[in-house]
Curated annotation (Swiss-Prot):
Region called Essential for glycoprotein binding, residue ranges: 115-151
Stretches for region Disordered: 14-33
Gene that encodes it: M
Name of the protein described by the UniProt record: Matrix protein
Gene Ontology annotations for the cellular component aspect, listed alphabetically: host cell cytoplasm; host cell endomembrane system; membrane; viral envelope; virion membrane
Length: 202
């Protein structure tokens, strides 16, 4: 029976050994996607609860026998239950993880590494979201294991408020990249003031 658990299995960088490289997800996989499109920075009408964050995100997938995005989606569907970071920033973390996994991975030993380094504009509805000046340094490993397969998912997200011009993180909730956010049950609503932006509800 497949199950999710947090266990102490580390995806080590094998510097001395030369293991067989992990295979990339097949071309026909339903979520082997190009990076999502961003809209050019524009002046937002509403400044309420809007913050620019300098983001560094990394998602490392460790699987000795290769992996499928279907397994990653299975893991991400339980994100709310397994997330161990600051819950005022869970929405931001979901956005970053989704954007990172929508990019192209780089092989690293037995691992595949997805990285995201951006300055992104986030807006939260009402009084939700991080406190003013609050920063995030979150690192977590989630594993999926059964009798035949092991997949480790290491997530590292750092976010600090900055004054560098950024980009709106998502303008089309029907885009392909948003499938991952749907898997993680990302809670958003369309901004009434700025139709091209989305407000985080978490």
């Amino acid at each position: 029976m497949n199950f999710l658990c947090k266990i102490v299995k580390n995806c080590r960088d094998e510097d001395t050994q030369k293991p067989s490289p992990a295979s990339a997800p097949p071309d026909g996989d339903d979520l082997w996607l190009p990076p999502p499109e961003y809209v050019p920075l524009k002046e937002l009408t509403s400044k309420k609860n809007m913050r620019n964050f300098c983001i560094n995100g990394e998602v490392k997938v460790c699987s000795p026998n290769g992996y499928s995005f279907r397994i990653l989606r299975h893991i991400l569907r339980s994100f709310d239950e397994i997330y161990s970071g600051n819950h005022r920033m869970i929405g931001l973390v979901k956005v970053v993880v989704g954007l990172a996994l929508s990019g192209a991975p780089a092989p690293e030993g037995m691992n595949w590494v997805y990285k995201l380094r951006r300055t992104l504009i986030f807006q939260w509805a009402d009084s939700r979201g991080p406190l003013e000046g609050e920063e995030l340094e979150h690192s977590q490993e989630i594993t999926w294991d059964d009798d035949t397969e092991f997949v480790g998912l290491q997530m590292r997200v750092s976010a600090r408020q900055c004054h560098i011009q950024g980009r709106i993180w998502c303008i089309d909730m029907n885009s392909r990249a948003c499938q991952l956010w749907s898997d993680m049950s990302l809670q958003t609503q369309r901004s009434e003031e700025d139709k091209d932006s989305s407000l985080l509800l978490e």
